[in-house]
Amino acid sequence: MNVAYYVLIFDHATDAFLECIGMNEAARIASRASVFVVEAHLTYEKEVMVGDALSVESRILDADSKRMHLFHQMTCPSNNPDQVVATNELMLLYVDMMTRRSADMPATIRSTIKKLICNQNDLPTPIQVGSTIGIRRR
């Protein structure tokens, strides 16, 4: 599977996460706001083939009034459900679509995010979080 399909799958996972916190399409239209991905990192841990059944787990690592630090990990349950095959780390920015500037998220969304972060606080930080690109010299 090539990079475009990984990005597409992770993009759908981001949409599902946004729906979960109350930022569905209707809410975005009503509030005239959306989120922009301002930074993204992908890691490829193991090859998957077109047609493999894939699963994505998402979690929010951190947030403030305008930003969300989101992490997705993809597995291939039919091969090895515990083997991470790819990850996607994102920084999302809440944007007022009328001014095209960052804005504070509504209080209801911030409250939902805060609850999610508290529920996930005991989980270990994935090793891929904060990774950088570079050639490691010996």
Where are each of the predicted segments found?
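Generic alpha-helical hydrophobic packing signal
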Residues: 67-68, 73, 102
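Hydrophobic beta-strand-centered segment that forms part of the acyl-chain substrate-binding groove
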Residues: 17-69, 83-88
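Beta-sandwich strand segments
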Residues: 81-84, 102
